[in-house]
Protein backbone atom coordinates (compact mmCIF):
# COMPACT_ATOMS: atom_id res chain seq x y z
CA UNK A 1 0.00 0.00 0.00
CA UNK A 2 1.37 3.44 -0.93
CA UNK A 3 1.87 6.32 1.49
CA UNK A 4 -1.15 8.27 0.20
CA UNK A 5 -3.47 5.33 0.81
CA UNK A 6 -2.01 4.85 4.28
CA UNK A 7 -2.58 8.51 5.09
CA UNK A 8 -6.16 8.33 3.79
CA UNK A 9 -6.88 5.28 5.95
CA UNK A 10 -5.47 7.00 9.01
CA UNK A 11 -7.53 10.17 8.42
CA UNK A 12 -10.75 8.13 8.06
CA UNK A 13 -9.91 6.13 11.16
CA UNK A 14 -9.14 9.21 13.24
CA UNK A 15 -12.42 10.81 12.18
CA UNK A 16 -14.34 7.64 13.04
CA UNK A 17 -12.71 7.33 16.44
CA UNK A 18 -13.47 10.97 17.24
CA UNK A 19 -17.17 10.16 16.92
CA UNK A 20 -16.79 7.08 19.09
CA UNK A 21 -15.00 9.02 21.83
CA UNK A 22 -18.08 11.20 22.24
CA UNK A 23 -20.31 8.14 22.12
CA UNK A 24 -18.24 6.45 24.82
CA UNK A 25 -18.91 9.35 27.18
CA UNK A 26 -22.60 9.32 26.31
CA UNK A 27 -22.82 5.56 26.95
CA UNK A 28 -21.48 6.07 30.46
CA UNK A 29 -24.42 8.38 31.18
CA UNK A 30 -27.14 6.15 29.71
CA UNK A 31 -29.64 4.58 32.07
CA UNK A 32 -30.64 0.93 31.84
CA UNK A 33 -33.92 1.99 30.27
CA UNK A 34 -32.18 4.07 27.61
CA UNK A 35 -29.86 1.21 26.68
CA UNK A 36 -32.77 -1.21 26.54
CA UNK A 37 -34.60 1.17 24.23
CA UNK A 38 -31.62 1.09 21.87
CA UNK A 39 -31.61 -2.71 21.93
CA UNK A 40 -35.33 -2.78 21.15
CA UNK A 41 -34.90 -0.22 18.36
CA UNK A 42 -32.32 -2.44 16.64
CA UNK A 43 -34.60 -5.46 17.06
CA UNK A 44 -37.48 -3.54 15.48
CA UNK A 45 -35.36 -2.92 12.36
CA UNK A 46 -34.53 -6.56 11.66
CA UNK A 47 -37.83 -7.65 10.02
CA UNK A 48 -37.54 -4.76 7.54
CA UNK A 49 -34.07 -5.81 6.41
CA UNK A 50 -34.11 -9.59 6.97
CA UNK A 51 -35.01 -10.44 3.37
CA UNK A 52 -32.23 -8.21 2.05
CA UNK A 53 -29.82 -9.74 4.56
CA UNK A 54 -30.60 -13.30 3.49
CA UNK A 55 -30.55 -12.47 -0.21
CA UNK A 56 -27.10 -10.87 -0.16
CA UNK A 57 -25.58 -13.72 1.87
CA UNK A 58 -27.15 -16.40 -0.33
CA UNK A 59 -26.00 -14.57 -3.44
CA UNK A 60 -22.43 -14.34 -2.15
CA UNK A 61 -22.39 -18.03 -1.26
CA UNK A 62 -24.16 -19.05 -4.50
CA UNK A 63 -27.10 -20.56 -2.65
CA UNK A 64 -30.56 -20.45 -4.20
CA UNK A 65 -33.25 -18.99 -1.97
CA UNK A 66 -35.24 -22.19 -2.58
CA UNK A 67 -32.45 -24.53 -1.42
CA UNK A 68 -32.45 -26.01 2.10
CA UNK A 69 -29.11 -24.27 2.62
CA UNK A 70 -30.89 -20.90 2.43
CA UNK A 71 -32.35 -21.69 5.86
CA UNK A 72 -28.82 -21.52 7.27
CA UNK A 73 -28.61 -17.85 6.32
CA UNK A 74 -31.93 -17.10 8.03
CA UNK A 75 -31.09 -19.03 11.18
CA UNK A 76 -27.44 -17.95 11.45
CA UNK A 77 -28.28 -14.39 10.47
CA UNK A 78 -31.34 -12.29 11.29
CA UNK A 79 -33.19 -14.94 13.34
CA UNK A 80 -30.25 -15.59 15.66
CA UNK A 81 -29.55 -11.88 16.01
CA UNK A 82 -33.17 -11.15 16.85
CA UNK A 83 -33.14 -13.88 19.51
CA UNK A 84 -30.00 -12.35 21.00
CA UNK A 85 -31.52 -8.87 21.09
CA UNK A 86 -34.65 -10.19 22.81
CA UNK A 87 -32.48 -11.91 25.41
CA UNK A 88 -30.38 -8.76 25.91
CA UNK A 89 -33.50 -6.66 26.37
CA UNK A 90 -34.83 -9.18 28.89
CA UNK A 91 -31.50 -9.07 30.76
CA UNK A 92 -31.70 -5.29 31.14
CA UNK A 93 -35.35 -5.49 32.16
CA UNK A 94 -34.60 -8.15 34.79
CA UNK A 95 -31.70 -6.16 36.24
CA UNK A 96 -33.83 -3.02 36.28
CA UNK A 97 -36.80 -4.70 37.98
CA UNK A 98 -35.27 -7.51 40.05
CA UNK A 99 -31.63 -6.50 40.46
CA UNK A 100 -30.23 -9.68 38.85
CA UNK A 101 -30.81 -11.82 35.74
CA UNK A 102 -33.67 -14.28 36.19
CA UNK A 103 -32.42 -17.79 35.48
CA UNK A 104 -34.77 -20.39 33.95
CA UNK A 105 -34.19 -22.67 36.95
CA UNK A 106 -32.19 -23.17 40.12
CA UNK A 107 -28.52 -24.18 40.08
CA UNK A 108 -27.80 -27.76 41.11
CA UNK A 109 -24.81 -29.76 42.28
CA UNK A 110 -24.12 -32.78 40.08
CA UNK A 111 -22.71 -36.18 41.07
CA UNK A 112 -19.11 -35.00 40.93
CA UNK A 113 -19.72 -31.87 42.97
CA UNK A 114 -19.83 -29.34 40.12
CA UNK A 115 -22.33 -26.48 40.29
CA UNK A 116 -24.49 -26.50 37.15
CA UNK A 117 -26.48 -23.39 36.23
CA UNK A 118 -29.48 -23.85 33.89
CA UNK A 119 -29.60 -21.52 30.88
CA UNK A 120 -32.30 -23.26 28.83
CA UNK A 121 -35.26 -23.11 28.34
CA UNK A 122 -36.16 -19.42 28.17
CA UNK A 123 -39.91 -19.62 28.52
CA UNK A 124 -40.63 -16.10 27.27
CA UNK A 125 -39.25 -17.20 23.89
CA UNK A 126 -41.12 -20.54 23.96
CA UNK A 127 -37.93 -22.59 24.24
CA UNK A 128 -39.66 -25.60 25.87
CA UNK A 129 -41.57 -26.06 22.61
CA UNK A 130 -38.97 -24.91 20.08
CA UNK A 131 -36.00 -26.73 21.64
CA UNK A 132 -37.98 -29.72 22.82
CA UNK A 133 -35.86 -32.38 24.49
CA UNK A 134 -32.80 -30.16 24.88
CA UNK A 135 -31.29 -28.92 28.12
CA UNK A 136 -28.29 -26.67 28.66
CA UNK A 137 -26.30 -25.83 31.76
CA UNK A 138 -23.19 -23.84 32.50
CA UNK A 139 -20.71 -25.67 34.71
CA UNK A 140 -18.90 -23.39 37.10
CA UNK A 141 -15.23 -23.85 37.90
CA UNK A 142 -14.76 -26.50 40.62
CA UNK A 143 -13.88 -23.93 43.29
CA UNK A 144 -17.05 -21.84 42.76
CA UNK A 145 -20.71 -22.38 43.58
CA UNK A 146 -24.11 -20.71 43.24
CA UNK A 147 -23.33 -18.05 45.85
CA UNK A 148 -21.23 -16.06 43.37
CA UNK A 149 -22.89 -16.43 39.97
CA UNK A 150 -23.01 -13.09 38.26
CA UNK A 151 -20.37 -10.84 36.74
CA UNK A 152 -20.63 -7.07 37.11
CA UNK A 153 -24.11 -6.25 35.89
CA UNK A 154 -25.32 -3.32 33.81
CA UNK A 155 -26.58 -0.52 36.04
CA UNK A 156 -27.78 3.07 35.88
CA UNK A 157 -24.34 4.07 37.17
CA UNK A 158 -22.86 2.15 34.21
CA UNK A 159 -19.35 1.66 35.57
CA UNK A 160 -18.68 -0.93 32.86
CA UNK A 161 -16.42 0.15 30.02
CA UNK A 162 -15.47 3.49 31.53
CA UNK A 163 -15.42 5.37 28.24
CA UNK A 164 -13.42 2.78 26.28
CA UNK A 165 -13.42 1.99 22.57
CA UNK A 166 -13.23 -1.62 21.35
CA UNK A 167 -12.00 -2.71 17.94
CA UNK A 168 -13.90 -5.74 16.66
CA UNK A 169 -12.41 -7.57 13.67
CA UNK A 170 -15.41 -9.39 12.26
CA UNK A 171 -15.80 -12.98 11.09
CA UNK A 172 -16.23 -13.60 7.37
CA UNK A 173 -18.20 -16.85 7.47
CA UNK A 174 -21.37 -16.45 9.58
CA UNK A 175 -23.24 -13.18 9.32
CA UNK A 176 -24.51 -13.03 12.91
CA UNK A 177 -21.03 -13.33 14.42
CA UNK A 178 -19.76 -9.77 13.88
CA UNK A 179 -23.15 -8.41 14.92
CA UNK A 180 -23.40 -10.32 18.19
CA UNK A 181 -19.71 -9.77 19.00
CA UNK A 182 -20.22 -6.04 18.59
CA UNK A 183 -23.38 -6.03 20.70
CA UNK A 184 -21.62 -7.96 23.45
CA UNK A 185 -18.89 -5.34 23.67
CA UNK A 186 -21.40 -2.47 23.85
CA UNK A 187 -24.03 -3.90 26.19
CA UNK A 188 -22.04 -6.37 28.31
CA UNK A 189 -18.65 -4.69 28.46
CA UNK A 190 -19.90 -1.12 28.17
CA UNK A 191 -17.46 -0.21 25.39
CA UNK A 192 -18.36 1.54 22.15
CA UNK A 193 -17.28 -0.35 19.04
CA UNK A 194 -15.39 0.18 15.84
CA UNK A 195 -16.44 -2.86 13.80
CA UNK A 196 -14.34 -3.78 10.78
CA UNK A 197 -16.15 -6.15 8.47
CA UNK A 198 -14.20 -9.02 7.01
CA UNK A 199 -13.52 -8.57 3.26
CA UNK A 200 -15.30 -11.89 2.67
CA UNK A 201 -18.65 -10.49 3.83
CA UNK A 202 -18.34 -6.76 3.30
CA UNK A 203 -21.64 -7.14 1.45
CA UNK A 204 -23.28 -6.88 4.90
CA UNK A 205 -22.29 -3.22 5.23
CA UNK A 206 -25.55 -1.75 3.93
CA UNK A 207 -27.71 -4.16 5.93
CA UNK A 208 -25.77 -3.61 9.14
CA UNK A 209 -25.77 0.17 8.85
CA UNK A 210 -29.56 0.01 8.47
CA UNK A 211 -30.25 -2.50 11.25
CA UNK A 212 -27.89 -0.83 13.71
CA UNK A 213 -28.74 2.75 12.77
CA UNK A 214 -29.89 3.50 16.36
CA UNK A 215 -26.40 2.66 17.65
CA UNK A 216 -24.63 4.54 14.86
CA UNK A 217 -26.77 7.64 15.43
CA UNK A 218 -25.80 7.61 19.12
CA UNK A 219 -22.14 7.18 18.11
CA UNK A 220 -21.88 3.88 19.98
CA UNK A 221 -20.95 2.05 16.78
CA UNK A 222 -19.01 2.76 13.62
CA UNK A 223 -18.57 0.22 10.82
CA UNK A 224 -15.62 0.16 8.43
CA UNK A 225 -14.69 -1.93 5.43
CA UNK A 226 -11.23 -2.68 4.13
CA UNK A 227 -8.37 -5.13 4.04
CA UNK A 228 -5.31 -5.80 6.13
CA UNK A 229 -4.18 -2.18 6.15
CA UNK A 230 -7.41 -1.07 7.86
CA UNK A 231 -7.19 -3.96 10.32
CA UNK A 232 -3.61 -3.10 11.22
CA UNK A 233 -4.50 0.56 11.69
CA UNK A 234 -7.29 -0.38 14.09
CA UNK A 235 -5.11 -2.79 16.04
CA UNK A 236 -2.33 -0.24 16.46
CA UNK A 237 -4.41 2.88 17.04
CA UNK A 238 -3.69 4.33 20.50
CA UNK A 239 -7.35 5.28 21.04
CA UNK A 240 -8.52 1.66 20.60
CA UNK A 241 -8.54 0.29 24.15
CA UNK A 242 -9.39 -3.37 23.52
CA UNK A 243 -9.68 -5.85 20.67
CA UNK A 244 -11.92 -8.77 19.80
CA UNK A 245 -10.77 -11.02 16.96
CA UNK A 246 -12.61 -13.81 15.16
CA UNK A 247 -10.49 -15.88 12.79
CA UNK A 248 -7.64 -18.37 12.93
CA UNK A 249 -5.00 -18.63 15.62
CA UNK A 250 -2.49 -17.62 12.93
CA UNK A 251 -4.26 -14.26 12.64
CA UNK A 252 -4.27 -13.91 16.41
CA UNK A 253 -0.57 -14.70 16.70
CA UNK A 254 0.35 -12.29 13.91
CA UNK A 255 -1.50 -9.50 15.72
CA UNK A 256 -0.09 -10.28 19.16
CA UNK A 257 3.41 -11.62 18.46
CA UNK A 258 4.38 -10.53 14.94
CA UNK A 259 4.16 -11.46 11.29
CA UNK A 260 7.13 -13.83 10.95
CA UNK A 261 8.21 -16.91 12.86
CA UNK A 262 11.46 -15.49 14.25
CA UNK A 263 9.82 -12.36 15.57
CA UNK A 264 7.02 -14.38 17.16
CA UNK A 265 9.47 -16.75 18.84
CA UNK A 266 11.58 -13.91 20.22
CA UNK A 267 8.62 -11.94 21.48
CA UNK A 268 7.06 -15.00 23.12
CA UNK A 269 10.36 -15.90 24.78
CA UNK A 270 10.64 -12.38 26.18
CA UNK A 271 6.92 -12.04 26.92
CA UNK A 272 6.91 -8.93 24.73
CA UNK A 273 3.63 -8.77 22.77
CA UNK A 274 3.25 -6.24 19.98
CA UNK A 275 -0.10 -5.11 21.34
CA UNK A 276 -0.46 -4.05 24.94
CA UNK A 277 -4.22 -3.92 25.21
CA UNK A 278 -6.78 -6.56 26.27
CA UNK A 279 -7.56 -9.04 23.49
CA UNK A 280 -10.41 -11.52 23.39
CA UNK A 281 -10.90 -13.95 20.53
CA UNK A 282 -12.82 -16.82 19.00
CA UNK A 283 -10.52 -18.95 16.86
CA UNK A 284 -10.47 -22.35 15.17
CA UNK A 285 -10.99 -25.91 16.33
CA UNK A 286 -10.48 -29.46 15.08
CA UNK A 287 -13.93 -30.30 16.41
CA UNK A 288 -14.26 -33.88 17.68
CA UNK A 289 -17.34 -36.10 17.73
CA UNK A 290 -16.79 -39.08 20.05
CA UNK A 291 -19.02 -42.13 19.55
CA UNK A 292 -19.21 -44.35 22.63
CA UNK A 293 -19.40 -48.04 21.62
CA UNK A 294 -22.59 -49.87 22.48
CA UNK A 295 -25.82 -51.10 20.96
CA UNK A 296 -27.75 -48.52 18.96
CA UNK A 297 -30.98 -49.11 17.06
CA UNK A 298 -31.04 -48.44 13.32
CA UNK A 299 -33.08 -45.31 13.96
CA UNK A 300 -30.59 -44.04 16.52
CA UNK A 301 -27.63 -44.72 14.23
CA UNK A 302 -29.33 -42.93 11.35
CA UNK A 303 -30.29 -39.95 13.49
CA UNK A 304 -26.78 -39.51 14.86
CA UNK A 305 -25.30 -39.97 11.38
CA UNK A 306 -27.57 -37.13 10.22
CA UNK A 307 -26.40 -34.96 13.11
CA UNK A 308 -22.78 -35.57 12.12
CA UNK A 309 -23.43 -34.99 8.41
CA UNK A 310 -25.33 -31.78 9.18
CA UNK A 311 -22.43 -30.54 11.28
CA UNK A 312 -20.08 -31.13 8.33
CA UNK A 313 -22.11 -29.55 5.52
CA UNK A 314 -23.57 -26.54 7.33
CA UNK A 315 -22.27 -23.33 5.72
CA UNK A 316 -20.26 -25.43 3.27
CA UNK A 317 -18.18 -26.52 6.30
CA UNK A 318 -16.70 -23.04 6.76
CA UNK A 319 -17.44 -23.21 10.49
CA UNK A 320 -15.20 -23.53 13.52
CA UNK A 321 -17.92 -25.85 14.89
CA UNK A 322 -17.90 -28.15 11.85
CA UNK A 323 -17.04 -31.71 12.86
CA UNK A 324 -13.47 -32.45 11.77
CA UNK A 325 -12.63 -35.66 13.67
CA UNK A 326 -14.97 -38.57 14.42
CA UNK A 327 -13.53 -40.78 17.17
CA UNK A 328 -14.78 -44.38 17.17
CA UNK A 329 -13.84 -47.69 18.74
CA UNK A 330 -12.07 -50.23 16.54
CA UNK A 331 -13.93 -52.89 18.55
CA UNK A 332 -17.41 -51.43 18.02
CA UNK A 333 -19.44 -53.83 15.84
CA UNK A 334 -21.57 -51.01 14.41
CA UNK A 335 -18.67 -48.78 13.40
CA UNK A 336 -18.74 -49.65 9.69
CA UNK A 337 -22.51 -49.30 9.56
CA UNK A 338 -22.40 -45.88 11.22
CA UNK A 339 -19.66 -44.52 8.97
CA UNK A 340 -21.40 -45.91 5.88
CA UNK A 341 -24.52 -43.97 6.87
CA UNK A 342 -22.51 -40.77 7.21
CA UNK A 343 -20.85 -41.42 3.83
CA UNK A 344 -24.21 -42.07 2.15
CA UNK A 345 -25.70 -38.90 3.56
CA UNK A 346 -22.74 -36.84 2.36
CA UNK A 347 -22.88 -38.37 -1.13
CA UNK A 348 -26.56 -37.45 -1.42
CA UNK A 349 -26.01 -33.80 -0.46
CA UNK A 350 -25.00 -31.63 -3.43
CA UNK A 351 -21.57 -30.04 -3.02
CA UNK A 352 -21.52 -26.33 -2.21
CA UNK A 353 -19.67 -23.40 -3.69
CA UNK A 354 -16.38 -23.06 -1.79
CA UNK A 355 -16.76 -19.33 -1.21
CA UNK A 356 -14.11 -18.84 1.47
CA UNK A 357 -10.65 -17.81 0.18
CA UNK A 358 -8.01 -20.54 0.12
CA UNK A 359 -10.52 -23.39 0.25
CA UNK A 360 -9.05 -25.30 -2.70
CA UNK A 361 -5.54 -25.18 -1.24
CA UNK A 362 -6.77 -26.29 2.20
CA UNK A 363 -8.80 -29.09 0.59
CA UNK A 364 -5.72 -30.38 -1.21
CA UNK A 365 -3.64 -30.08 1.96
CA UNK A 366 -6.21 -32.06 3.97
CA UNK A 367 -6.32 -34.75 1.27
CA UNK A 368 -2.54 -34.94 0.80
CA UNK A 369 -1.60 -38.26 -0.80
CA UNK A 370 -5.17 -39.18 -1.76
CA UNK A 371 -6.76 -39.21 -5.21
CA UNK A 372 -9.94 -37.11 -5.11
CA UNK A 373 -12.04 -36.66 -8.24
CA UNK A 374 -13.35 -33.11 -8.52
CA UNK A 375 -15.88 -32.84 -11.35
CA UNK A 376 -17.21 -29.34 -10.66
CA UNK A 377 -16.02 -26.01 -9.25
CA UNK A 378 -17.56 -27.05 -5.93
CA UNK A 379 -15.50 -29.22 -3.60
CA UNK A 380 -16.86 -32.67 -2.66
CA UNK A 381 -17.78 -33.60 0.89
CA UNK A 382 -14.98 -35.88 2.05
CA UNK A 383 -14.78 -38.34 4.95
CA UNK A 384 -11.32 -39.83 5.49
CA UNK A 385 -11.60 -43.00 7.58
CA UNK A 386 -9.06 -44.69 9.83
CA UNK A 387 -6.59 -41.81 10.06
CA UNK A 388 -3.52 -41.84 12.26
CA UNK A 389 -2.13 -38.86 14.23
CA UNK A 390 1.43 -39.79 13.24
CA UNK A 391 1.07 -40.26 9.48
CA UNK A 392 -1.60 -37.57 8.98
CA UNK A 393 -0.77 -35.16 11.79
CA UNK A 394 -2.21 -32.19 9.87
CA UNK A 395 -5.73 -33.61 10.20
CA UNK A 396 -5.36 -33.61 13.98
CA UNK A 397 -3.40 -30.40 14.50
CA UNK A 398 -4.72 -28.08 11.77
CA UNK A 399 -8.27 -26.87 11.32
CA UNK A 400 -8.84 -27.44 7.60
CA UNK A 401 -11.78 -25.01 7.46
CA UNK A 402 -13.07 -26.83 4.40
CA UNK A 403 -15.41 -29.73 3.55
CA UNK A 404 -13.17 -32.52 4.89
CA UNK A 405 -13.80 -34.61 8.00
CA UNK A 406 -11.55 -37.38 9.29
CA UNK A 407 -12.23 -40.43 11.44
CA UNK A 408 -9.84 -42.17 13.78
CA UNK A 409 -10.13 -45.36 15.82
CA UNK A 410 -9.12 -46.14 19.37
CA UNK A 411 -9.11 -49.67 20.80
CA UNK A 412 -11.60 -50.76 23.42
CA UNK A 413 -15.01 -52.36 23.65
CA UNK A 414 -15.74 -51.32 27.24
CA UNK A 415 -17.72 -48.05 26.96
CA UNK A 416 -16.30 -46.41 30.10
CA UNK A 417 -12.69 -47.28 29.30
CA UNK A 418 -13.13 -46.14 25.70
CA UNK A 419 -14.69 -42.83 26.70
CA UNK A 420 -11.90 -42.12 29.17
CA UNK A 421 -9.31 -42.88 26.50
CA UNK A 422 -11.15 -40.77 23.93
CA UNK A 423 -11.30 -37.78 26.28
CA UNK A 424 -7.57 -38.00 26.91
CA UNK A 425 -6.96 -38.41 23.17
CA UNK A 426 -8.92 -35.36 22.00
CA UNK A 427 -7.52 -33.23 24.82
CA UNK A 428 -3.94 -34.11 23.93
CA UNK A 429 -3.94 -34.86 20.18
CA UNK A 430 -6.42 -32.42 18.63
CA UNK A 431 -5.96 -28.70 18.14
CA UNK A 432 -8.49 -26.42 19.78
CA UNK A 433 -10.68 -26.04 22.84
CA UNK A 434 -13.95 -24.68 21.45
CA UNK A 435 -16.43 -27.56 21.42
CA UNK A 436 -16.82 -31.34 21.36
CA UNK A 437 -19.69 -33.82 21.11
CA UNK A 438 -20.24 -37.25 22.68
CA UNK A 439 -22.75 -39.72 21.24
CA UNK A 440 -23.70 -42.27 23.90
CA UNK A 441 -26.20 -45.16 24.02
CA UNK A 442 -29.24 -44.62 26.23
CA UNK A 443 -28.13 -47.50 28.43
CA UNK A 444 -24.78 -45.81 28.99
CA UNK A 445 -26.37 -42.48 29.91
CA UNK A 446 -28.72 -44.22 32.33
CA UNK A 447 -26.26 -46.64 33.94
CA UNK A 448 -22.97 -44.75 33.74
CA UNK A 449 -24.06 -41.25 34.71
CA UNK A 450 -21.03 -40.75 36.94
CA UNK A 451 -18.60 -41.84 34.21
CA UNK A 452 -20.25 -39.52 31.71
CA UNK A 453 -20.12 -36.53 34.05
CA UNK A 454 -16.45 -37.22 34.79
CA UNK A 455 -15.73 -37.36 31.06
CA UNK A 456 -17.57 -34.09 30.44
CA UNK A 457 -15.65 -32.50 33.30
CA UNK A 458 -12.28 -33.62 31.91
CA UNK A 459 -12.89 -32.42 28.35
CA UNK A 460 -10.96 -29.16 27.83
CA UNK A 461 -13.58 -27.47 25.71
CA UNK A 462 -15.76 -24.40 26.16
CA UNK A 463 -18.83 -26.39 25.11
CA UNK A 464 -19.50 -30.11 25.44
CA UNK A 465 -22.59 -31.63 23.84
CA UNK A 466 -24.25 -35.00 24.30
CA UNK A 467 -25.92 -36.35 21.14
CA UNK A 468 -26.15 -32.85 19.65
CA UNK A 469 -24.13 -30.57 17.39
CA UNK A 470 -22.35 -27.71 19.14
CA UNK A 471 -23.66 -25.24 16.57
CA UNK A 472 -26.85 -25.29 18.64
CA UNK A 473 -24.93 -23.88 21.63
CA UNK A 474 -23.83 -20.96 19.49
CA UNK A 475 -27.36 -20.29 18.26
CA UNK A 476 -29.00 -20.36 21.69
CA UNK A 477 -27.19 -17.15 22.74
CA UNK A 478 -27.83 -17.75 26.45
CA UNK A 479 -24.64 -19.82 26.90
CA UNK A 480 -21.22 -18.22 27.13
CA UNK A 481 -19.52 -18.94 23.79
CA UNK A 482 -15.77 -19.31 23.51
CA UNK A 483 -12.80 -21.60 24.04
CA UNK A 484 -11.87 -23.33 27.28
CA UNK A 485 -10.62 -20.82 29.90
CA UNK A 486 -7.20 -22.52 30.04
CA UNK A 487 -6.10 -20.57 26.93
CA UNK A 488 -3.74 -17.60 27.09
CA UNK A 489 -1.96 -15.20 24.72
CA UNK A 490 0.92 -17.60 24.05
CA UNK A 491 -1.38 -20.56 23.47
CA UNK A 492 -4.78 -19.15 22.51
CA UNK A 493 -6.07 -22.44 21.08
CA UNK A 494 -9.73 -21.68 20.21
CA UNK A 495 -9.71 -18.26 21.78
CA UNK A 496 -9.61 -16.17 24.92
CA UNK A 497 -12.71 -14.90 26.66
CA UNK A 498 -16.30 -15.35 25.57
CA UNK A 499 -19.36 -13.67 24.06
CA UNK A 500 -23.18 -14.10 24.26
CA UNK A 501 -23.70 -15.12 27.94
CA UNK A 502 -27.04 -13.37 28.31
CA UNK A 503 -27.33 -14.28 31.99
CA UNK A 504 -24.02 -12.52 32.79
CA UNK A 505 -22.51 -15.56 34.49
CA UNK A 506 -18.92 -15.65 35.74
CA UNK A 507 -16.48 -18.21 37.16
CA UNK A 508 -17.60 -20.79 34.58
CA UNK A 509 -15.67 -23.44 32.71
CA UNK A 510 -18.00 -24.79 30.04
CA UNK A 511 -21.50 -25.14 28.68
CA UNK A 512 -23.05 -28.61 28.57
CA UNK A 513 -25.87 -29.24 26.09
CA UNK A 514 -27.80 -32.51 26.20
CA UNK A 515 -30.36 -33.99 23.86
CA UNK A 516 -31.83 -37.33 22.79
CA UNK A 517 -30.30 -39.70 20.26
CA UNK A 518 -33.36 -39.18 18.05
CA UNK A 519 -34.77 -35.67 17.85
CA UNK A 520 -38.43 -34.96 17.10
CA UNK A 521 -39.43 -32.99 15.18
CA UNK A 522 -36.53 -33.22 12.74
CA UNK A 523 -33.86 -30.60 13.53
CA UNK A 524 -34.11 -27.70 11.13
CA UNK A 525 -30.34 -27.83 10.51
CA UNK A 526 -30.62 -31.31 8.93
CA UNK A 527 -30.10 -31.04 5.17
CA UNK A 528 -33.01 -33.45 4.65
CA UNK A 529 -35.46 -31.03 6.30
CA UNK A 530 -38.04 -30.27 3.61
CA UNK A 531 -39.40 -27.01 5.04
CA UNK A 532 -36.33 -25.51 6.70
CA UNK A 533 -36.64 -22.09 5.08
CA UNK A 534 -40.29 -21.79 6.11
CA UNK A 535 -39.33 -22.75 9.66
CA UNK A 536 -36.57 -20.13 9.62
CA UNK A 537 -38.87 -17.32 8.55
CA UNK A 538 -41.56 -18.42 11.01
CA UNK A 539 -39.01 -18.43 13.82
CA UNK A 540 -37.89 -14.93 12.91
CA UNK A 541 -41.52 -13.74 13.01
CA UNK A 542 -41.93 -15.33 16.43
CA UNK A 543 -38.85 -13.56 17.79
CA UNK A 544 -40.10 -10.32 16.21
CA UNK A 545 -43.32 -10.47 18.22
CA UNK A 546 -43.16 -13.35 20.72
CA UNK A 547 -46.73 -14.58 20.97
CA UNK A 548 -48.47 -17.90 21.27
CA UNK A 549 -50.47 -16.96 18.18
CA UNK A 550 -47.31 -17.29 16.06
CA UNK A 551 -46.60 -20.86 17.16
CA UNK A 552 -49.12 -22.78 14.99
CA UNK A 553 -47.53 -21.72 11.69
CA UNK A 554 -44.05 -22.46 13.05
CA UNK A 555 -45.09 -25.95 14.14
CA UNK A 556 -46.98 -26.54 10.90
CA UNK A 557 -43.77 -26.08 8.94
CA UNK A 558 -41.58 -27.85 11.52
CA UNK A 559 -43.70 -31.01 11.52
CA UNK A 560 -43.66 -31.21 7.73
CA UNK A 561 -39.87 -31.30 7.63
Range-by-range predicted roles:
Residues 2-11, 15-41, 159-160, 167, ...:
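Conserved C-terminal structural/oligomerization subdomain of aldehyde/semialdehyde dehydrogenase
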Residues 165, 177-229:
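PLP-dependent aminotransferase-like
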Residues 1-150, 184-185, 197-202, 211-216, ...:
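N-terminal Rossmann-like NAD(P)+-binding subdomain of aldehyde/semialdehyde dehydrogenases
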Residues 133-176, 180:
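Active-site-adjacent "gating/activation" loops or surface patches in catalytic cores
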Residues 184-185, 233-234, 425:
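Hydrophobic/aromatic ligand-binding patch that stacks against planar heteroaromatic rings
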Residues 171-172, 198-201, 226-229, 245-249, ...:
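An acidic- and aromatic-residue-enriched active-site/binding cleft used to recognize and process polar
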Residues 168, 194-196, 221-222, 242-244, ...:
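Short catalytic-loop micro-motif centered on adjacent basic/acidic residues
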Residues 48, 192, 199, 209-220, ...:
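ALDH superfamily catalytic-core signature
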